[in-house]
Regions:
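N-terminal periplasmic "start-of-domain" segments of outer-membrane beta-barrel proteins
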Residues: 31-64, 86
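N-terminal periplasmic accessory domains that precede
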Residues: 39-41, 62-68, 85-88, 114-120, ...
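Extracytoplasmic beta-strand/coil segments of soluble accessory domains associated
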Residues: 65-105
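Outer-membrane beta-barrel signature, preferentially recognizing the C-terminal barrel domain
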Residues: 97, 252-267, 381-439, 445-473, ...
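Short acidic/polar hinge/loop motifs at secondary-structure boundaries
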Residues: 104-132
Length: 601
């Protein structure tokens, strides 16, 4: 047997022993608290957003990146509307936060992130955002922050046509259809959209027009579910295709690039009593063409993911074993790895939960764990958690040619989180604060010869605190979302970044939403404030993005007994210069209209 085979055999034996020990602990602990009325699935204190009439329309006709701007915990990174969108959430960066689809981690293990511009908003639930260290308890590779995506075919008959127009060259058309035949429920969603993204912007005292940042995409989703022999089953398919142009920054325009992406994801789950089995297949193809003068450089890559997940849940425990095979091929890397995860969560009492998680990746075993304490106070629930999680190196970081580093260590977090919720009558107040230390932060750094390579450079500290206040009085809805972030690099091999703030973390972010009835419709006023951000690791002044303030106005109206719903919006009313990435200005004041045509019930 080869040396690699011997290592794999020994590793799998150790992982099997770990799974057996975790499972036996869970079975032994079931007798400790069999009278508890709170299930383990309710162990995390998660805040739900307030959705207005305008939000419901945006949810159907936009992507997750655009919709989540209403949440101050979410910090977007995007060149232009519809372009590739990544995010910072709860103090973490994009690769440290995970995106789950019905419990399956679909964040690419090739790049480490998922482009939120191709995630339809319809997959977002009111409690989809999980901030801070609690994200590690529901993902297989998360450290801090994440999104839980899902949607459901309820069997309710629905047929809606969706139309959207924008003043910057955008057009979208979609259809949402649902119902049932026999005992099988179904729901389908298809949407096509495009935009030239032609909009004015200012640079100093000069006015210009943005061009060359257009995009188009297609999204199709279909779900069937039902019950057979007392077992619940569900099948999903999700297909996306997109093209995104990038004319370059306003300082280096004239070197356009084109990103083409096709992704097919399919999932099937079967659940009977305490047992649930899920299977997932994901295939993605991507081509990036960079135009430099007369030379076109094209980088084509593929990514495949196969995941089989088994869940065994009791009243006081959750047990998970997940086996995945991921491969990345194409121009710049060609590799495949096995990923095995075992997770055990146990409710020891009404107050205490414990989570243990282990993974096999790149012939190594990684471990993580968390303690969660919840108060018994029903009016003011308080929760405290502390733990340590990991972020595994991605395929690109390990095998990118040239520059990959197979000797990378996994990133490691140590953190503590406190959350509290207070609700009385029409007032709801939620507060959370996270303190995290990250070790072995992976950063791409230029080496000798100009080749960039990922290395474990730094240790950093982040503190993220969020306040959510919701007040409903009659026909008026009021929500304030506030997030404050503090970060510092504690240890670094690069002296210029030691003691500096992490990049793309605004020191504060505030979103205020006021929604009320007027003239038989609903008017929504949404104000945004975003603090200073550093975009250079040495925090040089030239890389500072100054604080920005802007407001959006939306008016929603329905008629013909609700068969026609109309929402008009004025974006960036104050015509503020908005920038998420330096030298890529976002649109100033512009307009949009969304129409939803519902069939008769």
């Amino acid at each position: 047997m080869s040396a690699l085979g011997q290592v794999l055999q020994r590793t799998m034996k150790r992982l099997f022993v770990l799974i057996v020990l975790l499972t036996s602990l869970g079975l032994q602990a079931q007798s400790y608290d069999t009278l508890s009325t709170t299930t383990i699935s309710e162990s995390l204190l998660r805040l739900e957003e307030m959705r207005t009439a305008a939000d419901s329309m945006v949810l159907l006709q936009s992507n997750a990146a655009q919709y989540l701007l209403k949440d101050s915990r979410f910090q977007l990174r995007q060149y232009a509307p519809g372009s590739v969108a990544t995010f910072n959430l709860g103090g973490a960066n994009s690769s440290q936060s995970r995106v789950l689809w019905d419990g399956i981690d679909i964040s690419s293990m090739a790049s480490g992130v998922l482009d939120l511009s191709i995630v339809p908003g319809i997959l977002l639930q009111p409690s989809s955002v999980v901030d801070g260290s609690n994200a590690g308890s529901f993902g297989s590779n998360g450290m801090a922050g994440g999104l839980a995506l899902n949607w459901k075919a309820s069997g309710k008959r629905e047929f809606s046509t969706l139309i959207g127009l924008t003043s910057i060259g955008g057009l979208s058309f979609g259809v949402l259809n649902g119902g049932h035949f026999g005992k099988v429920n179904y729901r389908s969603f298809i949407r096509v959209q495009e935009s030239s993204n032609t909009y004015p912007y200012s640079l100093g005292s000069q006015d210009y027009t943005m061009t060359g940042m257009g995009f188009n995409d297609l999204t199709f989703m279909q779900q069937y579910n039902g019950v057979y022999n007392r077992a619940h089953w569900k099948s999903d398919i999700w297909f996306t295709q997109s093209e995104k142009s990038n004319s370059g920054s306003i300082l280096a325009a004239g070197s356009p690039s084109l990103l083409q992406d096709r992704a097919l994801r399919a999932k099937y789950s079967w659940q009977k009593r305490r047992h649930k089995i899920s299977a997932f297949i994901g295939h993605e193809w991507q081509a990036y063409t960079d135009t430099l003068n007369v030379i076109n450089l094209t980088d084509t890559n593929t990514y495949r993911q196969y995941t089989l997940q088994y869940n065994y849940n009791t009243k006081n425990t959750k047990n998970l074993v997940e086996v995945g095979h991921v491969s990345a091929g194409g121009t710049s890397r060609d590799a495949a790895l096995l990923n095995v995860t075992a997770k055990h969560e146990i409710k020891l009492s009404d107050s205490w939960n414990i989570l243990a998680r282990g993974a096999f990746w790149q012939d190594k075993i990684y471990g993580a764990g968390q303690f969660v304490w919840s108060s018994k106070h029903k009016k003011i629930p308080i929760q405290w958690s502390t733990g340590s999680f990991y972020r595994l190196p991605t395929m690109n970081e390990l095998y990118w040619n040239p520059g990959g580093n197979i000797a990378l260590a996994a990133e490691r977090s140590y953190g503590s989180k406190v959350s509290a919720l207070y609700q009385v009558n029409d007032l709801k107040i939620g507060l959370s604060t996270d303190q995290l230390i990250f070790n072995n932060l992976i950063q791409w750094t230029p080496l000798m010869g100009g080749v960039w390579s990922p290395v474990n450079l730094e240790r950093a500290y982040t503190s993220s605190s969020s306040l959510l206040v919701q007040l409903v009085k009659g026909d008026m809805n009021n929500e304030v979302s506030v997030t404050h972030q503090y970060s510092r690099v504690l240890v670094s091999s690069n002296s210029s970044s030691r003691g500096k703030q992490l990049i793309y973390r605004p020191n504060f972010q505030v979103v205020h939403t006021l929604d009320f009835r007027i003239l038989k419709g609903r008017l929504q006023l949404r104000s945004h404030a975003m603090g200073k951000r550093h975009t250079l690791r040495d925090n040089a002044d030239v890389g500072i993005l100054n604080p920005e303030y802007w407001m959006d106005i939306a008016y929603s109206y329905s008629f013909m007994s609700g068969q026609v719903q109309l929402t008009g919006r004025v974006h960036n009313v104050s015509n503020t210069s908005k920038t998420f990435i330096p030298y890529y200005p976002m649109p100033g004041r512009h307009y949009s209209i969304n129409i939803k045509l519902n069939s008769k019930k």
